[in-house]
């Protein structure tokens, strides 16, 4: 069974982990609606990408009307 030959110091462990930090995203403003969106992704608020509608937004459904 493999075991460590020597103890890894806190300093050495920290140096190894120094590159593991997550990088914060860089959101862009949607040119259509102004909401923040991820770069090179479809806007979640309006469904537009590169000045054209990619995902059609569904209208709100009134549940009371459909139940009758």
Curated annotation (Swiss-Prot):
Listed GO MF terms: structural constituent of ribosome
UniProt GO BP: translation
Keyword annotations of the record: Ribonucleoprotein, Ribosomal protein
GO cellular component: large ribosomal subunit
Source organism superkingdom: Bacteria
Region (Disordered): 1-25
Family the UniProt entry places it in: Belongs to the bacterial ribosomal protein bL32 family.
Protein name, UniProt field: Large ribosomal subunit protein bL32
